[in-house]
């Protein structure tokens, strides 16, 4: 019966991750310590799928196990389709240096050069970096007489990070079925058009953040926690916005539009009784 329908679908996703780095550790006389790291990271994602549907099976139970038994495949009327995702690649090289002196003064700096295939060639690469500094006041000589303070540290940090969180297909010139109509001879005709407005000027969303904080531990570790005050600003926000038709084919497009700022404070308090 033509009502006996069998379908089979196969989807395959492949993720490739590769990372490599080396670390240099050195302790110098006088309490100086250096920890340096340099390396790379690579990520790639690919996906593809296949779908098949056949009809007119003689036995209901056989349709999922032997798609050849449906007569529509032999008659050339079975439905088959395949799909392939847009490849997504992310590559970066990075370096980081940490320095400390007698566990009292700390500083660190990092930089990351990162490229994403989601963006056009002119906007693909960007640099992201951060610097931090800290002072463990509790290890100073003038704090030794205050026996109820076990740890008191002040720290400051500033950094720039990037975001490319959108589907890779948004930067591909994809075509899709737009309209279809029947010709006088009874044959269906199809037209194809763009399914999205590619934006060659799209670039990384960037977040700039600075933080001032305090870590503490009092009364032999029975009271501990931290306090942070932060300010954040996000530039070149990635957002899908409405665009006019014409000149655009579709009514929306991903753009870098606007900025967002926030500030606030956070704290944690813990205790052991």
Placement of each model-derived feature along the sequence:
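Extracellular/periplasmic, surface-exposed regions of secreted and cell-surface proteins
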Residues: 1, 7-8, 12-273
